[in-house]
Each structure stands twice: as C-alpha cells, then as structure tokens.
Amino acid sequence: MVQAWYMDESTADPRMPHRAQPDRPVGLEQLRTLGVLYWKLDADKYENDPELEQIRKTRNYSWMDIITICKDSLPNYEEKIKMFFEEHLHLDEEIRYILEGSGYFDVRDKEDKWIRISMEKGDMITLPAGIYHRFTLDEKNYVKAMRLFVGEPVWTPYNRPADHFDARVQYVKFLEGTA
C-alpha cells in the first residue's frame, strides 16, 4: 500500500524521505480530497493485466509508453531530473505506473504544504490537471514507469506560478468544493 507523509522544510538531497518531525502520515482518503487517485497493481503482468485494461478503458487512457529514469538510459539525465523536480502543473492528468524501482511524487495540499508520496513497483497514480507537483527518484536512482495519456501524449510542464491556466482555476474550484 502506498505511503505518504508531510515533508520537512529541508532543502537537502531531494532523494531522501524528508519526513516532517513528528511524523505526519497522509492516507489515501486525504489524497483523494486533493484529486489524487491510486491503484495497487501487479507490475509483473502489466502487459496482460485485465485490471489495468479496465482502468485504461474506464478513464480513457488510450496511449502509453514506458520511460526508464537512470543515468545509464536517460539522455540529459541531470537536466531532466532537475526539470522533473521543479514545481509545476499540467493542463491534463499525469498518470504513472511504476513497473520497477521507486521514486517520490510531491503534491501540494490545500494549505500549500508538501505531501510526499512514495511510489514503488506496482503503484499507479493519477495526479489531476492543475495540481502543483514534482517528481524525484529516491536513493536507488532508478525507476521504470508506464506513462499513460488520454489521446495523444502531451507532457508540457508549466512551472509555478501558473495560476492563470484554466486547469489550475478549475482545480482550485475543485479544492473549494465548487467545481
């Protein structure tokens, strides 16, 4: 099951857990109130998984690819890692399914505090359009993930501040319960 927690304020190595002290765990229900969706799947059978196919069909995730993030396989690795960790939003959902390895998605809560979501093999997450977030590897420096999209793949990050985009306006309304 996924683990999530409020982060400390440290700017040290982002690959470390950065748990607030005292520890402030975050459950799936709290993540759902932010629009974050989570599934635990069997990553060993991702190529022929009826549960994954049902999720894709229900949510219209019609396109996918696989990305491996590690120094040996990702061109411009250092540049990409910095870009992924820059706080940003997207105009569409961001959907990731961890097939191997691990990393962290950080998302902002309703009070603009960071929540760290630990992602490991078998974890699938959907971040809503308009949520400020970032991604980093953990100390293992390796993740292989399936990226899913509705229609043609679009992965355009808009670094904060990006409050003027309709996706952000709609997300804030969702948080306020008025969407």
Swiss-Prot record:
Its EC number is 1.13.11.54, 1.13.11.53. It catalyses: 1,2-dihydroxy-5-(methylsulfanyl)pent-1-en-3-one + O2 = 4-methylsulfanyl-2-oxobutanoate + formate + 2 H(+); 1,2-dihydroxy-5-(methylsulfanyl)pent-1-en-3-one + O2 = 3-(methylsulfanyl)propanoate + CO + formate + 2 H(+). It is a peripheral membrane protein. The keyword Nucleotide-binding does not apply. Keywords: Amino-acid biosynthesis, Cell membrane, Cytoplasm, Dioxygenase, Iron, Membrane, Metal-binding, Methionine biosynthesis, Nickel, Nucleus, Oxidoreductase. Its cofactor is Fe(2+); Ni(2+). GO terms for molecular function: acireductone dioxygenase (Ni2+-requiring) activity; acireductone dioxygenase [iron(II)-requiring] activity; iron ion binding; nickel cation binding; oxidoreductase activity. Induction: Up-regulated by androgens in the prostate, but not in the other tissues tested. It comes from the Eukaryota. The keyword S-adenosyl-L-methionine does not apply. Belongs to the acireductone dioxygenase (ARD) family. Catalyzes 2 different reactions between oxygen and the acireductone 1,2-dihydroxy-3-keto-5-methylthiopentene (DHK-MTPene) depending upon the metal bound in the active site. Fe-containing acireductone dioxygenase (Fe-ARD) produces formate and 2-keto-4-methylthiobutyrate (KMTB), the alpha-ketoacid precursor of methionine in the methionine recycle pathway. Ni-containing acireductone dioxygenase (Ni-ARD) produces methylthiopropionate, carbon monoxide and formate, and does not lie on the methionine recycle pathway. Also down-regulates cell migration mediated by MMP14. Monomer. Interacts with MMP14. This is Acireductone dioxygenase. It comes from Rattus norvegicus.
